[in-house]
């Protein structure tokens, strides 16, 4: 059934109602915060944001008598937007409720624009981005390449992870192996695992130990199943593929941080069906295609668009097989979408 189109007045009314609801929620939260700060608060201490629930977050105490315990905390109004992985300064209050009073500097942050084009951080202090894909839903090179550009832009090390390797068959196998070979030749670390059968999970765990990682990828690729296999006590709900679309159903509604027994953390984030790059420049995209780097600036014309121009270094490399058509198509698609991407 076609999606019903709303006119301008209907859209305005919906936005007005949503704005009023948000204002009422913020007012209730501010009242609760004032009551909390009016009581006795404990000393300032360090904490780690392990989950975010709208106007409140869960903070794990990092020092003091309550180290390792989790507290629900309110946010002071003057704080910037906090995300899972943030290190903060907080004070404990009554009944296990606390107040975050400051945000510590971030070493890295993974951001994406919201529907209004404003940058929104989705995870902080991460050093490894695990790009998850699977035989179904069908993996799209363009989406993988967008994640690789985002990783390069954020200064994160990427790990490509093919989950559900047990679903590889004679029909989808040739295409999948050709896809993987492109990234292997470029030197990207790549693992094939099956969270369902356990194949390759030990090698994955070794790659994650000692790092703060985030899983990204389409819904339905098995991110929650991977978390359940790596951390059986996490209890992350698993969703099936939607029968009518072949796309995954969302199961994780907020980013949550989990600890590994041997050190390191994992942030499980909601499924992202399309990863836009409206917040990066053309130069950032070019940096994200590592095999293109030495070619930029060597074309005959300084303003070469790498389309049909004579003397184009990229087109020459494409003809000679030094650039794969799959990657060239992704590059062109991403460049063309820079001014119109939305999430």
Curated annotation (Swiss-Prot):
Disulphide bonds in the chain: none
Annotated Gene Ontology cellular component terms: cytoplasm
Any single GO BP term: ribosomal small subunit biogenesis
Cofactor: Zn(2+)
Membership in a protein family: Belongs to the TRAFAC class YlqF/YawG GTPase family. RsgA subfamily.
Subunit structure: Monomer. Associates with 30S ribosomal subunit, binds 16S rRNA.
NCBIfam families registered for this protein in UniProt: PRK12288.1, ribosome small subunit-dependent GTPase A
Protein name: Small ribosomal subunit biogenesis GTPase RsgA
Organism: Pseudomonas putida (strain GB-1)
């Amino acid at each position: 059934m076609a999606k019903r189109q709303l006119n301008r007045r209907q859209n305005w009314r919906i936005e007005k109602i949503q704005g009023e609801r948000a204002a009422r929620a913020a007012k209730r939260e501010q009242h609760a915060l004032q009551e909390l700060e009016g009581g006795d608060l404990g000393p300032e201490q360090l904490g780690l944001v392990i989950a975010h629930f709208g106007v409140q977050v869960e903070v794990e105490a990092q020092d003091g008598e309550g180290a390792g315990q989790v507290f629900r905390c309110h946010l002071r109004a003057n704080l910037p937007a906090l995300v899972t992985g943030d290190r903060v300064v907080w004070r404990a209050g009554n009944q296990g409720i606390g107040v975050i009073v400051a945000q510590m500097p971030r070493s890295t942050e993974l951001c994406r624009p919201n529907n209004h084009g404003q940058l929104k951080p989705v995870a902080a202090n991460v050093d490894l981005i695990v790009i998850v894909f699977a035989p179904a839903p069908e993996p799209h090179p363009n989406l993988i390449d967008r994640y690789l550009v985002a990783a390069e832009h954020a200064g994160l090390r990427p790990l490509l992870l093919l989950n559900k390797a047990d679903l590889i068959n004679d029909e989808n196998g040739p295409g999948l192996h050709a896809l993987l070979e492109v990234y292997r030749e470029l030197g990207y670390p790549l693992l094939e695992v099956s969270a369902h059968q356990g194949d390759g999970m030990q090698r994955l765990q070794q790659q994650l130990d000692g790092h703060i990682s985030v899983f990204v990828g389409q819904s339905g690729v098995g991110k929650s199943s991977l978390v359940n296999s790596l951390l059986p006590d996490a209890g992350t709900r698993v969703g099936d593929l939607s029968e009518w679309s072949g796309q995954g159903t969302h199961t994780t509604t907020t980013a949550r941080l989990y600890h590994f027994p041997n050190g390191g953390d994992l942030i499980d984030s909601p499924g992202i069906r399309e990863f836009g790059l409206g917040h990066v420049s053309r130069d950032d995209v070019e940096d994200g295609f590592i095999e293109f780097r030495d070619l930029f600036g060597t074309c005959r014309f300084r303003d070469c668009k790498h389309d049909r121009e004579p003397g184009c270094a990229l087109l020459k490399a494409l003809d000679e097989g030094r650039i794969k058509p799959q990657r060239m198509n992704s590059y062109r698609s991403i460049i063309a979408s820079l001014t119109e991407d939305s999430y």
